[in-house]
Regions:
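Short acidic (Asp/Glu) patches
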Residues: 82-96
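Thiol-based oxidoreductase modules, predominantly thioredoxin-like and allied folds used
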Residues: 65-84
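Local sequence-structure signature of Cys/Sec-based thiol-disulfide redox active-site neighborhoods
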Residues: 30-64
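Conserved strand-to-helix beginnings and helix N-cap segments that scaffold or border functional pockets
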Residues: 51-55, 82-83, 121-122
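Short helix-loop-beta junction
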Residues: 6, 10-13, 58-67
Length: 136
């Protein structure tokens, strides 16, 4: 498990921008069971999370269409919450960072780590904005 002093600033990059921090399996079940659209970010300490995933997600939310609910859990820190979230992200294998869009509790769009690594934040944002246009 990562030390809290390392993780908190990375969590705050999302939570200070409207994301609810999910730290328990129960919170994950409740969040993903909501009506409407829910964006789930599995946050991480890795460089591709800092350089592409988090900035890309935040930039994606500047458009007209966006998800109804924004939630996040941190891999290697919120271990039980992330394990529960990954159950809802099947059949995709565990991946962090990763970004999932749910509609009425069903997974409808997924960005895995291999889609994030080596791609700029703008590409992540464009991918998500296209999904929002279609789904939200």
């Amino acid at each position: 498990m990562y030390p809290e002093e390392l993780v908190i600033p990375m969590k705050e990059e999302l939570t200070e921008n409207g994301f609810k921090d999910l730290t328990t399996p129960e919170q994950v079940v409740e969040a993903l069971g909501q009506k409407g659209t829910t964006l789930l970010v599995i946050n991480s300490v890795c460089g591709c999370s800092a350089g592409a995933a988090r900035p890309g997600v935040l930039y994606s939310l500047t458009g007209d269409k966006k998800p109804d609910h924004l939630v996040t859990a941190f891999a290697g820190f919120d271990t039980e919450a992330v394990a529960e979230a990954r159950k809802h992200m099947a059949p995709f294998p565990p991946s962090s960072p990763s970004i999932a869009l749910f509609k009425d509790g069903e997974l409808v769009h997924m960005i895995e780590r291999h889609h994030i690594e080596g791609h700029p934040a703008g590409a992540i944002a464009a991918n998500l904005q296209a999904a929002y246009e279609e789904i939200c």
